From Swiss-Prot:
Binds directly to 23S ribosomal RNA and is necessary for the in vitro assembly process of the 50S ribosomal subunit. It is not involved in the protein synthesizing functions of that subunit. This is Large ribosomal subunit protein bL20. One of its GO terms (cellular component) is ribonucleoprotein complex. The keyword Ribonucleoprotein applies. It comes from the Bacteria. InterPro entries: Ribosomal_bL20, RIBOSOMAL_L20_CS, Ribosomal_protein_bL20_C. PROSITE patterns: RIBOSOMAL_L20. It holds the Pfam family Ribosomal_L20. Keywords: Ribonucleoprotein, Ribosomal protein, RNA-binding, rRNA-binding.
Length: 118
């Protein structure tokens, strides 16, 4: 049985990991052992934060909607309750955009919610 030398495969594997670790600080971008750990940890952070991003954006939208709603004399929870009663199906992303960039349109939506609550 011939002897297997791993020079080519090892170099390829090391190169792949070190390329993934480009831009990391110090040994994390130069030393294979350290770089491998850094790349694994980066992957864990990326996996976790892809899920957290969804939560963080929803929280941001809610904060923006709440600020816009309070400018129009209504709290966030009352606004959402009013929109549900009025059967207005605008998601929070769009509501937040209206609250930030289209104040008049958002005021009309708030008015619709107020009418449904009254």
């Amino acid at each position: 049985m011939p002897r297997v030398k791993r020079g080519v495969t090892a170099r390829r594997r090391h190169k792949k990991v070190l390329n993934q670790a480009k831009g990391y600080y110090g040994a994390r971008s130069r030393v294979f052992r350290v770089a491998k750990q850094a790349v694994i940890k980066a992957g864990q952070y990326a996996y976790r934060d892809r899920r957290q991003r969804k939560r963080q954006f929803r929280a941001l939208w809610i904060a923006r909607i709440n600020a816009g709603a309070r400018d129009n004399g209504l709290s966030y929870s009352r606004l959402i309750a009013g929109l549900k009663r009025a059967n207005v199906e605008i998601d929070r992303k769009v509501l937040a955009d209206l609250a930030m960039n289209e104040k008049a349109a958002f005021a009309a939506v708030v008015q619709k919610a107020k009418e449904a609550l009254a």
